[in-house]
Amino acid sequence: MSGWRLLLTRPDEECAALAASLGEAGVHSSSLPLLAIDPLEETPEQRTLMLDLDRYCAVVVVSKPAARLGLERLDRYWPQPPQQTWCSVGAATAAILEAYGLDVTYPEQGDDSEALLALPAFQDSLRVHDPKVLIMRGEGGREFLAERLRGQGVQVDYLPLYRRRAPDYPAGELLARVRAERLNGLVVSSGQGLQNLYQLAAADWPEIGRLPLFVPSPRVAEMARELGAQRVIDCRGASAPALLAALTSAA
């Protein structure tokens, strides 16, 4: 596996953790974060959502930043969390919640809303009178999960905790990094990260798009192919073990 030289594009803190795991496996990596996370100020409406947390039969946490920021709110308002189902769309997010002491339901395979919806344990949590679900996430984002749940008669509320933005890099920075460090693979962890990669590449995309591109889900894989990426590898998850398994298979 030591032949891989990867560009990591997650937010700073996540890049550092992933780089450490890859380094232990003998994989060289270089970090160029393509997503920055800015926490949002709490509004009175959001405070009310947290104070009413015990109204929800399930809380869905969609990302690691949402988990970290959501737990800060939970600690502030609920020293003893109410009894309800906590869910995440991936193992890495679940690990943050579990470290806090929560029991978490999450899909073993796949880091997306589709995989969560297919979980019997999640569907079981909705079989109550007047089911309500709170989704902790970033500002904006996919509506798929909420739409599907509302189609099942579930009331869905959002708790936006952060805003994503693309860091500023000079034109040509991406290709210059790839060439200077002889990188032979790219890793993205979300659809927005992929879009930011594509926009940063700009006129260099034809060359960048020829590199193997490791993505976390079938949805992001399809997005990458639509953008013209020539070799897309679906890791079926955004965790380090999922990426390492995909690297072994793709070698």
Swiss-Prot record:
Keywords annotated in UniProt: Lyase, Porphyrin biosynthesis
Stored Pfam families: HEM4
Pathway(s) this gene product operates in, as recorded in its UniProt entry: Porphyrin-containing compound metabolism; protoporphyrin-IX biosynthesis; coproporphyrinogen-III from 5-aminolevulinate: step 3/4
GO molecular function: uroporphyrinogen-III synthase activity
Domain of life from the UniProt record: Bacteria
EC number: 4.2.1.75
One of the protein's GO biological processes: protoporphyrinogen IX biosynthetic process
InterPro entries: 4pyrrol_syn_uPrphyn_synt_sf (IPR036108), 4pyrrol_synth_uPrphyn_synth (IPR003754), UROS/Hem4 (IPR039793)
Chemical reaction(s) catalysed: hydroxymethylbilane = uroporphyrinogen III + H2O
Top EC category: lyase
Task of the protein: Catalyzes cyclization of the linear tetrapyrrole, hydroxymethylbilane, to the macrocyclic uroporphyrinogen III.
Assembly and interaction partners: Monomer.
Sequence similarity: Belongs to the uroporphyrinogen-III synthase family.
Protein's recorded name: Uroporphyrinogen-III synthase
